[in-house]
């Protein structure tokens, strides 16, 4: 039999442990949800399934530094020997890649071409290598945001039709959301 002065302490220990557990849980839980909401996650739904193509799981990366941020979301697709790579990029890398669009660059060679134009009201750069049946379509979403579809083993017209299936305007709105 326990003395009466110890009975109160014995009851206090389990209650104290339970209280400590819930306090620790309430402190740590917000950090786990912050980690789950990475900026790239808002872009993943725009990397849609393409009919007739096998798409890998979309993935992304967000990097924050003291003076700059960069966010990317990517998805790879395959159909037999043909391949496509869709990406949405926000940050300095996108700003640099958009320079040819902003300058209105146009170039033609015997092996391919690089042409800037307007598609669906948005500035785009279409690069195509006819020998390899490969190329890239870059869509300017903002001054530091872009969507690109790189492809290989696909005719240019089909690649443009594939790129047209993505919702560029919705991407543009999402890249401007901070």
Model-found features: residue ranges?
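Bacterial N-terminal signal peptides that target proteins for export
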Residues: 4, 10-22
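Low-complexity intrinsically disordered segments
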Residues: 7-8, 30
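Bacterial N-terminal signal peptides
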Residues: 20-30
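Serine/proline-rich low-complexity intrinsically disordered segments, especially terminal tails, linkers
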Residues: 28, 53, 166-167
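Sec/Tat signal peptide C-region and signal peptidase I cleavage site
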Residues: 31-36
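Short, solvent-exposed recognition patches
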Residues: 38-130
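A short, solvent-exposed beta-edge/loop patch
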Residues: 78-79, 83, 107-178
